[in-house]
C-alpha cells in the first residue's frame, strides 16, 4: 500500500523555487493498478522518485506498506525497492542481450540464485506474453513489448 500525506516537493533553482508537487494526499491499496498521467512538468516523475526513494519530500510523509520512507535507513532502500514493480518510460534494456538475458540480469543483480533465475525468467516472460521472444534482442521488439 502507498500513502502520501500532505506531500510537497520543491526544487531550488538559481533565484527561484520550482514546485513539483503541492499538498499531495493519496492512498493506493496493495494490488491496485494505477496510471499516472499529466502534462510535461506536472510532477509524474517526481511522484515516482519519491516512491522509489530516489528523492525525499520537501514536506509531508510517504508510506509504503506502513513504513515511513522519510525515516527509513539508506541500507534498507534496496530491499524495499525489490518489492516494487515500475514500468519506466525509458526501457533500460541492454541492447546486446536477449530478452531472457535482460530479465535474468535484473534478477542476478538482486542476488537471486541461478536455479531460481532459470525457473522465474520463463515464468515472468509468460506472464507478459513474451515467452516466444526470449531469444530476441530488444530492438526486435515493439515499444510495448520492451516495456
Residue locations for each model-derived region?
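Conserved ABC ATPase signature
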Residues: 136-141, 145-146
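A short, flexible loop at the N-terminus of ABC-type nucleotide-binding domains that lies
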Residues: 1, 10-23, 73
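Helix-to-loop junction immediately C-terminal to a conserved catalytic motif
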Residues: 52
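Short coil-to-helix segment of the ABC ATPase nucleotide-binding domain corresponding to the Q-loop/switch region
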Residues: 97-105
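Conserved ABC ATPase "signature" region
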Residues: 67-68, 104, 108, 115-133
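Conserved ABC transporter NBD signature motif
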Residues: 60-68
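ABC ATPase NBD coupling module
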Residues: 69-85, 114, 118
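Walker A (P-loop) phosphate-binding loop of ABC-type ATPase nucleotide-binding domains
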Residues: 38-42
Amino acid at each position: 500500500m502507498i500513502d502520501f500525506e500532505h506531500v510537497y516537493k520543491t526544487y531550488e533553482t538559481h533565484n527561484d523555487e520550482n514546485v513539483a508537487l503541492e499538498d499531495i494526499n493519496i492512498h493506493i491499496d496493495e494490488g491496485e493498478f494505477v496510471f499516472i498521467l499529466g502534462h510535461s512538468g506536472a510532477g509524474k516523475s517526481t511522484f515516482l522518485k519519491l516512491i522509489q526513494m530516489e528523492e525525499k519530500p520537501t514536506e509531508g510523509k510517504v508510506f509504503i506498506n506502513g513504513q515511513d520512507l522519510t525515516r527509513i535507513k539508506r541500507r534498507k532502500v534496496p530491499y524495499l525497492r525489490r518489492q516494487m514493480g515500475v514500468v519506466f518510460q525509458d526501457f533500460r534494456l541492454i541492447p546486446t542481450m536477449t530478452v531472457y538475458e535482460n530479465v535474468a540480469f535484473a534478477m542476478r543483480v538482486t542476488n537471486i540464485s541461478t536455479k531460481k533465475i532459470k525457473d522465474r525468467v520463463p515464468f515472468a516472460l509468460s506472464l507478459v506474453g513474451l515467452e516466444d521472444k526470449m531469444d530476441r534482442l530488444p530492438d526486435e521488439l515493439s515499444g510495448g513489448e520492451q516495456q
